[in-house]
Amino acid sequence: MTIVHLLEKNAREFPNDVALVEINPEQPETRRITWSEFELVESSARRPYRREITWGVFEEKANRFANMLTQNGIGKGKKVAILLMNCIDWLPIYFGILKTGALVVPLNFRYSSDEIDYCLDLAEADVLVFGNEFVGRVEAVADKISKNCTLCKKSLLINLNI
């Protein structure tokens, strides 16, 4: 049983259970607090930003990304690099790549433009999926990268609900 099969099994058996949680203490909580949760005597500290997805949603997002890759000719033997911050979207993208049979090339978010270019060249990556925070670094070497590698900005994946 592969790791992809484990995701499929969990999505089938526990579709509504929480699979992934993202907590960012630097972002304010957007959830409304009800009167019963509100502390009348003493104010509590702000809750950190929290986002979660269920096993069913996790599987759905991975499938959508896998389908997008497959429709664009990415499959077995191809290499897809991921340049994202540590976020809840990272794993569905990772599993989506694995579902196509392609290889995942995770890149460290601390890499400079030249290091990104070097790693993509060394890995012979066919696609680079990157977050908005990396636009500047990717643009700095886009001329060299785009000759061999298709660039895919994460914000473009919003239409796929990924």
Language-model-detected regions and their locations in the chain:
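Solvent-exposed, charged/polar functional surfaces in cytosolic regulatory/catalytic domains
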Residues: K9, E13, R64-M68, K144
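Residue-level recognition of oxygen-bearing side chains
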Residues: T2, R64, D89, E124, ...
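A short N-terminal helical cap/helix-turn-helix that marks the beginning
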Residues: M1-V21, V41
